[in-house]
Design a protein with these regions (language model features):
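Beta/alpha (TIM)-barrel catalytic core signal, keyed to glycine-rich beta->alpha loops juxtaposed to Asp/Glu
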Residues: 181-189
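Conserved beta-strand positions
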Residues: 5, 47-49, 112, 158-160, ...
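N-terminal pre-domain/capping segments
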Residues: 1-107, 140, 178
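Glycine-/small-residue-rich active-site loops that bind phosphorylated ligands and cofactors
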Residues: 54-57, 164, 189
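Active-site acidic/histidine proton-transfer and metal-coordination neighborhood
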Residues: 63-64, 68-76, 80-182
């Protein structure tokens, strides 16, 4: 078994994305390369990253990140959102953009927060009439992105996160029915 860490776990070190309306008041302790060095010191096998951790998403920088991870023997996973505008828009990508970044850093996983908007708190709103059209749009995006993901060798994983029910994620997966479109069930949220 490999042990990785989501950079949000180092939020108090200035790493990871802003979340829940909280914006960091201090600079990150490490850049992406220092973070990888720290991961090795901690005995980790890999990191689950966002664009906030990468610092930049231009191709030259992403190649440097990939090379640095390979030199350190670390796996990388890429985490992005379809619409993180409410808390940290640095994380917002189309599925195709997220797949391209994941491929560039050598990640075989692109974990996606779907960012479903609900008319009221999550409790009792599974498959709410205002949610179903959003799920359908995500399914269409995933249908289009599936072949792109397969060509890139990146499995995309739709996450339930804090705003989707597992049944809703499975509904999308069953509609898409593509070997490179899967699920990340977050049992902590």
């Amino acid at each position: 078994m490999l042990l990785g860490l989501h950079t949000y776990s180092l939020h108090l070190h200035g790493m990871g994305q802003n979340w829940g309306g909280f914006k960091l008041r201090w600079e990150p302790v490490w850049d992406i390369f220092g973070l990888m060095d720290e991961a090795k010191k901690l005995g980790l096998d890999g990191l689950h990253l966002t664009a906030a951790d990468l610092g930049a998403t231009d191709q030259e920088h992403l190649r440097d990140v990939r090379r640095a991870a390979e030199e350190r023997g670390l796996f990388l996973e890429y985490n992005f959102s379809l619409d993180a505008s409410e808390y940290d828009d640095r994380l917002t990508h189309t599925m195709e953009e997220g797949i391209a970044i994941a491929e560039s850093i050598g990640s075989d996983i692109g974990k996606i927060s779907m960012d479903v908007r609900r008319p009221h708190p999550v409790c009792g709103s599974a498959f709410h009439p205002e949610v179903i059209p959003q799920l359908e749009k995500i399914a269409v995006k995933a249908l289009t992105a599936g072949p792109v993901a397969q060509n890139a060798g990146v499995r995309i994983c739709l996450e339930n996160h804090t705003e989707a029910f597992s049944d809703e994620v499975l509904w999308i997966i069953n509609r898409v029915n593509h070997p490179y479109v899967g699920v990340c069930v977050d049992t902590n949220n």
